[in-house]
Amino acid sequence: QLNFVDKLCKLIYPKTIFIKEHPARVGSFEAKKVKELLTQNKNLRIIDPRVNNFEIIKNCQYLVSINSKAGYEAILLGKHVITFGESFYKNSNLIKYCQNLSELKNSHNYLEKKISNQEIIDFFSNIKQQCFKGALYDMSPINVKNFSNSIKQILNND
């Protein structure tokens, strides 16, 4: 991921890039490598991982994500999202999905397009229709049962 950030910084220089470490991965990058990255890229800033995503997203021009729910949150706020990962929302017309950084150069038209409130409502409505009851990482008996029922329903629909 640090290599990705380094290439992204160079690609869109002089625009400033703000990165936030994933809360589940705090401290997983070597401090020395992060310092080198900051030294080599004057347009890079690091945000404290405890800062609320919505506060960051409200102030960004657009969001670039490898694979994070932050992209989903950015759509909620009407922001453009460029994703490089296998997110559940990558095929939406509200998202610019890129397989590699060279495709980022072709994002100008996407970034100029206005996102309407109706498109945002439709996006979340569509996602809600495809979701199942339950919570990620909840191992309670009722949640496990909900998960099991979801799998059965999917298998019965195929």
Question: What does each of the following model-derived ranges do?
Answer:
Residues V5-P49:
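Catalytic donor nucleotide-activated moiety binding site of glycosyltransferases and closely related
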Residues P14, Y62, S87-K90, Y110-K114:
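Short, well-ordered loop/turn and helix-capping segments at boundaries between secondary-structure elements
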Residues K15-I17, V81, K114-E119:
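Hydrophobic anchor at the start of a short beta-strand
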Residues A24, A70, F88, S102-E103:
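Short, glycine-/Ser/Thr-/acidic-enriched flexible segments
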Residues K33-K35, L63, K96-N100:
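Short low-complexity, flexible loop/linker segments enriched in glycine and/or proline
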Residues D48-K96:
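A donor-sugar binding/catalytic signature common to diverse glycosyltransferases
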Residues L94-D158:
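Leloir-type glycosyltransferase catalytic cores
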